Amino acid sequence: MIDPKLLRNNIEVVNAGLAKRGVQLDVQEWASLETRRKDLQSKTEKLQAERNAGAKQVGQIKKSGGDASEIMARMQAIGDEIKAAEVALSELQNEIEQKALSIPNLPDESVPAGKDENDNVEISKWGTPRQFDFEIKDHTDLGEWMGGLEFETATKLTGSRFSVLKGPLARLQRALTQFMLDTHTLKNGYTEAYVPYLVNADSLRGTGQLPKFEEDLFKLQGEKEYYLIPTAEVPVTNFVRDEIIDADRLPLKYAAHTPCFRSEAGSYGRDTRGLIRQHQFDKVEMVQIVKPETSMQALEELTAHAEGILQALGLPYRKILLCGGDMGFGATKTYDLEVWVPSQNTYREISSCSNMGDFQARRMKARYRMDQKKTELVHTLNGSGLAVGRTLLAVMENYQREDGSIEIPEVLRPYMGGATFID
């Protein structure tokens, strides 16, 4: 959530930042809300002051043996007015907060303005796409030929945009997951976390999925208001909700492997074939909780950790700086990593690494203790390290052989019992 002080006192500054996203707030509407809030606040304070003065007056009159009934009746009326004013003020503040919760984060000054992915900026490329001397297959054909990737079975079990993996492909996906977690925990300094796959609404509000993006979530029916997680970012980042962390504990760095569940609302007709866009997919997520002055450096580090996985697997990719209009709701700066997909002759997103600044921390009331008296909001970051299903398809396509078998990247062979290929 954006700092309420900015919304109250510098709405033009907010609009100047949001312009990079192509978003503008109604200045007059916010000015009107602030005027009403100030008027109600002032009215409440004046009534409270009048009540306090009256209480003293009643005490003095009673002390002198006089009749204070008239003033006491007035105090009763003032009390009723105060209650009404407080209710009105609370309702207005709630209205303002709900509106504020739907405002996206302000882009960092280094983020380019732009409307969509066409305005993103390519930062770098790594690796050279392989030149095949035979007709290649996409991962769907490869998987079905091997008998290890079944979409029809998944459709029978559940519906569209689900998949079933069997045999060597299921083991290869597990190998990828283990390799990612081992790299992040043993080499990159993250603490592994196992988390619930169901979260409550407070957790989703904390990280910004609610209230604006409820249609993208799967919600359980029943007495409890539980949602399936869209990413491990939600439960892991909420570790620090309503917490005050000692400064010497920062940074906190977590890595978690979970399934992710997304309704893919608005994506009808897009990527209907294969593993690119699924309702359920696995991901290894990195989360960092840091001091504000280190968050931009932490973003570079976290992104490099995701890049390290791709480099170790020998998968060509490019690094993209997202423009304001293509960034996620809560991000102040985002890098996307896009892996080379031979069958599509293009790069596709495999990781998104974001600095959220204090946007989530303000919603979560997550702070750190600077000294005995002063606390400050932490900054939060998250990134895919990596999306496992998309990494699997990238390995399948980039390492395919003419006979339909798939070479196993060297770093994965210890997780595959020493095997060098699968067929």
Swiss-Prot record:
HAMAP family: Ser_tRNA_synth_type1. PROSITE patterns: AA_TRNA_LIGASE_II. The lineage of its organism: Bacteria, Pseudomonadati, Pseudomonadota, Gammaproteobacteria, Moraxellales. It comes from Acinetobacter baumannii (strain AB307-0294). It is found in: Cytoplasm. It comes from the Bacteria. The gene is serS. CDD domains: SerRS_core (cd00770). InterPro entries: aa-tRNA-synt_IIb, aa-tRNA-synth_II, aa-tRNA-synth_II/BPL/LPL, Ser-tRNA-ligase_type_1, Ser-tRNA-synth_1_N, SerRS_1_N_sf, SerRS_core, tRNA-bd_arm. This is Serine--tRNA ligase.
